[in-house]
Amino acid sequence: MSTVNVQIGLHELLNGSNAQIQLSVPQLVEKVLMRNEGKLTSTGAVSASTGKYTGRSPKDKFIVKEASVADKIAWGAVNQPISEEHFNKLYTKVLEYLKEKEELFVFKGFAGADRNYRLPIQVINEYAWHNLFVHQLFIRPTEEELTTHESGFTIVSAPNFKADPAVDGTNSEAFIMVSFEKRIVLIGGTEYAGEMKKSIFSIMNFLLPEQDILSMHCSANVGEEGDVALFFGLSGTGKTTLSADPNRKLIGDDEHGWSDNGVFNIEGGCYAKCVNLSHEKEPQIFDAITFGSVLENVIINDQTRIADYNDTTLTENTRAAYPMHAIDNIVLPSVAGHPNTIIFLTADASGVLPPISKLSKEQAMYHFLSGYTSKLAGTERGVTSPQATFSTCFGSPFLPLDASRYAEMLGEKIEKHDAKVFLVNTGWTGGEYGVGKRMNLGYTRAMIQAALNGELAKTETAKHDIFGLEVPLHVPGVPDEVLMPEQTWADKAAYKAKAIELANEFKANFKKFDSVSEDIINLGGPIA
């Protein structure tokens, strides 16, 4: 199937009598309720269930192996190849399936808040609530922009279309396929809305580096003086909590690009976890869940329609999707200058990493590539005790290119813009998980504040004898003994043994990076 034929098929779909294009939020909410796709909550949000797929399905994600990208993609478990033949046949079947639907919902918008680098996108949805989701998550066009909008990538989403693995070359009934040549994302068999968001992020992680822009899985905020901070971290490290600062404006909570102009948000909304959400803990998120917002897999009281954020009957991965303008303390458009401070967050359950360390460029690249944190019991099936986990660049499921490409770009930008990088451990202190305790949030906030306002640039440091990290000896508002992890352990020999054990896990993980320069290994990693 040629690209021309793909466009003809899309044109027919978009011009069919069943295509509802660019409906407003109230219109989409009406459609969701009329079609029994969801319920209205007491705050005016739409609540929907995603069926058996309550999270991303990484084993069902494919990139079409096409001549123009075959030697660029880092093929493997994350980027699984599928043939053009399989894609073309499945794409044709999905289009025929959607043509028969009574209604289809189409959103046209953008990914990328910087107008110089934004990607025009369109999304064709079988479900009205999915279309409401993308309307809130991506960047919405003005009336004028809509008249000249030409899509650079199209998502075709048909959750009720099930693949046949024996015929379609998939691993299950679900599929998420990206064709870079045909500029199509094809999604079926799963109702989880996050697949649409993360597909566009994966695409931007391919397209932006080609323009010398670093794409990043991080949150970002900016201070009153225009100083920009990035927060990288895997689930459970405190990224959302620590980047939501009343004294700083939010640029974005999850996906960003770093160009020669500065930092920009890739999205136009937020996709926040809402397990155990309360107004006391996360007032910004709690208050954003109003009319037009989408709740995913949250249990709602049948009579009062009040959301119970503590009920994880369906999944712990309950989510809320809302536009950026639902939050008060934001920058719009979501662009800012070059980062002054970069924070890598890790929740170290072994309790051996310092609560804050200053990183050299090589150490920053090493820890960026490592993407370390601890998986805690309850976050995944089968995890009963904490396990060291490494997610390359703090976002390995979304990286189509070789990881070293992103790390090299980060190193270049750190050097060019003199960004200060810190590794912050929000995990355990005084012993490992089960013995020690979780790092005091007030102390972590004080350390981050000191990093942001430049106080740590002039403070005295000591080199950690196992990890080689520069550890500040004094931080305002934090007891000195907390800063050196060994001092918080009663059994110093046990500390050393545990630290060496973690250092060896870092080294073992890093062996997979065979294209990384020796400097990063020798100057960036553990020294014992």
Curated annotation (Swiss-Prot):
It holds the Pfam family PEPCK_ATP. Keywords: ATP-binding, Cytoplasm, Decarboxylase, Gluconeogenesis, Lyase, Manganese, Metal-binding, Nucleotide-binding. It comes from Bacillus cereus (strain B4264). This is Phosphoenolpyruvate carboxykinase (ATP). Binds 1 Mn(2+) ion per subunit. It comes from the Bacteria. Substrate binds at R56, Y192, K198, R319. GO terms for cellular component: cytosol. Its EC number is 4.1.1.49. Its cofactor is Mn(2+). It is found in: Cytoplasm. Involved in the gluconeogenesis. Catalyzes the conversion of oxaloacetate (OAA) to phosphoenolpyruvate (PEP) through direct phosphoryl transfer between the nucleoside triphosphate and OAA. Gene3D superfamilies: 3.90.228.20, Phosphoenolpyruvate Carboxykinase, domain 1 (3.40.449.10), Phosphoenolpyruvate Carboxykinase, domain 2 (2.170.8.10). One of its GO terms (molecular function) is metal ion binding. It is an enzyme of class 4 (lyase). Belongs to the phosphoenolpyruvate carboxykinase (ATP) family. NCBIfam families: pckA (TIGR00224), PRK09344.1-2 (NF006820), PRK09344.1-3 (NF006821).
